[in-house]
């Protein structure tokens, strides 16, 4: 409860390409519409299935289809992304300027790459579960994103209406956590 912080206009004047493409770029920390919170990462943290087994004991196939993180309008899209351990993440630069993709995890190796405009997409994988991995652009300090990494497919990111769906969850008792960059889980 309480007042939602107002989005603030981002000063992109340090890069004319950013100012030209996104003259009214706003912060995305608190994406709230009609009291509904977007960009919260929701996942099963732990649980026991109806047969008594633990969700952490199960093995799930890693998707071969990559998730996508795009640098477009001098901000990351999506702002929050969920993947499974070792699922490829394709990173593209749709802007007319150079970006720097910098994953700053706690449990995975640091990954820091420059991506000029017009460059080919890059692919990155995170080998260890981690909630959440911050991603930034060293050249544009306002650019940030977060990647949630789990060993299972039971995660979602809340939409603009605050809704989410955890698909295919087997019957059992679970601890479900919602993470948001603005505070408590």
Region annotations inferred by a language model:
Residues 2-185:
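Extracytoplasmic copper-binding redox domains, predominantly the cupredoxin/blue-copper superfamily
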């Amino acid at each position: 409860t309480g007042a939602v912080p107002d989005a603030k206009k981002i000063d992109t004047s340090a890069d004319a390409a950013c100012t030209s493409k996104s003259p009214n770029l706003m912060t995305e920390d608190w994406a709230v519409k009609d009291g509904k919170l977007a960009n919260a990462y929701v996942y099963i943290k732990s649980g026991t299935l109806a047969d008594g087994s633990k969700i952490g004991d199960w093995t799930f196939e890693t998707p071969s289809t990559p998730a996508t993180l795009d640098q477009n309008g001098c901000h990351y899209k999506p702002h929050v992304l969920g993947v499974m351990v070792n699922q490829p993440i394709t990173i593209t630069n749709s802007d007319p300027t150079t970006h720097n993709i910098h994953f700053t995890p706690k449990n995975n190796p640091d990954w820091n790459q420059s991506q000029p405009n017009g460059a080919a997409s890059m692919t990155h994988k995170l080998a260890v579960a981690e909630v959440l991995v911050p991603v930034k652009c060293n050249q544009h300090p306002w650019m940030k994103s977060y990647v949630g990494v789990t060993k299972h497919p039971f995660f979602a990111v809340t939409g603009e209406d605050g809704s989410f769906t955890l698909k295919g969850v087997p019957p059992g008792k679970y601890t479900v956590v919602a993470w948001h960059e603005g505070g408590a889980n």
